[in-house]
């Protein structure tokens, strides 16, 4: 994002920030468009988005951290009922995102919806979040919808196998030697 400092217009900067916010929250364009200050709550010392998906009506509760919290603080207004992000149409947002991506040397076709995929895969899944939790955060009614996002990469498989190995080794080390011998004979 640092390389995009020459972004020309205020509108383009808002789109960039909203896109990044979506990368760290999983909110869709339409849900971000309707995000208001009353959807932001302080719960247990943390900021949360408490809302409902526009598309499905399912409840969504997303804890804000790091980059997303920083972006929110730059756009949060005290006026209740006011949208946090004043965004142009989805088509204009996608056009701006394309321009921004080219300016920073990314030449793939990226749309606002790509941010939602980024959250599901790069942010959540690759950091060990379960598919069930991701499904809830994305506001999906069915896990099968979430599985579209869940491309499993080798790193995740390797980390999961490592955790499994450590757990089994830990359990095995707690068994006395006599029981270990009987377990080995079974196999």
Region locations from a protein language model:
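C-terminal secondary-structure termini that scaffold catalytic or DNA-interacting sites
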Residues: 164-187
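Conserved tyrosine-mediated DNA breakage-rejoining catalytic core shared by Y-recombinases
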Residues: 1, 25, 34-71
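C-terminal catalytic core of tyrosine-transesterase DNA break-rejoin enzymes
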Residues: 20, 24, 30-31, 99, ...
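Catalytic-site neighborhood detector that most strongly recognizes the C-terminal catalytic loop/helix
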Residues: 53-57, 90, 138-163
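Basic, Lys/Arg- and aromatic-enriched nucleic-acid-binding interface segment
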Residues: 1-29, 78
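Short basic/aromatic active-site micro-motif
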Residues: 13-16, 88-91, 107-127, 140
């Amino acid at each position: 994002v640092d390389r995009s400092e020459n972004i020309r217009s205020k509108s383009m900067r808002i789109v960039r920030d909203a896109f990044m916010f979506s990368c760290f929250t999983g909110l869709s364009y339409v849900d971000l468009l309707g995000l208001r200050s009353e959807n932001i709550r302080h719960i247990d010392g943390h900021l949360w988005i408490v809302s409902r998906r526009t598309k499905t009506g399912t409840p969504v509760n997303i804890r804000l951290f790091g980059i997303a919290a920083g972006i929110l603080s730059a756009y949060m207004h005290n006026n209740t009922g006011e949208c946090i992000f004043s965004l142009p149409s989805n088509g204009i947002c996608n056009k701006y995102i394309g321009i921004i991506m080219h300016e920073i040397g990314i030449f793939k076709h990226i749309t606002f919806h790509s941010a939602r995929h980024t959250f599901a895969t790069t942010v959540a899944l690759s950091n060990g979040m379960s598919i069930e939790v991701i499904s809830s955060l994305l506001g999906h009614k069915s896990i099968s919808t979430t599985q579209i996002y869940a491309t499993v990469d080798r790193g995740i498989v390797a980390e999961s196998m490592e955790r499994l190995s450590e757990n089994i080794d830990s359990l095995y080390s707690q068994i006395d030697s006599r029981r270990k011998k009987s377990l080995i004979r079974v196999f």
